[in-house]
Swiss-Prot record:
PROSITE patterns: RIBOSOMAL_L14. GO terms for molecular function: large ribosomal subunit rRNA binding; structural constituent of ribosome. The gene is rplN. Gene3D superfamilies: Ribosomal protein L14. InterPro entries: Ribosomal_uL14 (IPR000218), Ribosomal_uL14_bac-type (IPR005745), Ribosomal_uL14_CS (IPR019972), Ribosomal_uL14_sf (IPR036853). SMART domains: Ribosomal_L14. Signal peptide: none annotated. Keywords: Ribonucleoprotein, Ribosomal protein, RNA-binding, rRNA-binding. This is Large ribosomal subunit protein uL14. GO terms for cellular component: cytosolic large ribosomal subunit.
Length: 123
């Protein structure tokens, strides 16, 4: 459950280390984002010579949450932290060329197959 002002780790090599959610996209008064949802973020901490810099406002897809995701068989997959993958504002494709850490099968939609293929582990 990601809401406005939530700090997230970045699970790709775009150059950002820490980002903050500034808006949950998809609905006029939507409060929370879960795994697979797109959010608007601002970069709070970045490494030198990265593809993004501090202060950039971009889109991102949530790939891991502490709240987790419930499967139809009743199992729940939770993670130790909240993480996202930064997307291009126009094409909504990942900016980075590598994904760090596991991602869930819920991302397996037409939009995010690139993230699934780059991820080292799909749960």
């Amino acid at each position: 459950m990601i809401q406005e002002q939530t700090m997230l780790d970045v699970a790709d090599n775009s150059g950002a280390r820490s980002v903050m959610c500034i808006k949950v996209l998809g609905g006029s008064h939507r409060r929370y984002a879960a795994i697979g949802d797109i959010i608007k973020i601002t970069v709070k901490e970045a490494i030198p010579r990265g593809k993004v810099k501090k202060g950039d406002v971009l889109k991102a897809v949530v790939v891991r949450t502490k709240k987790g995701v419930r499967r139809p068989d009743g199992s729940v997959i939770r993670f130790d932290g909240n993480a996202c993958v930064i997307l291009n504002n126009n094409t909504e494709q990942p900016i980075g060329t590598r994904i760090f850490g596991p991602v869930t099968r819920e991302l397996r939609s037409e939009k995010f197959m690139k993230i699934i293929s780059l991820a080292p582990e799909v749960l």
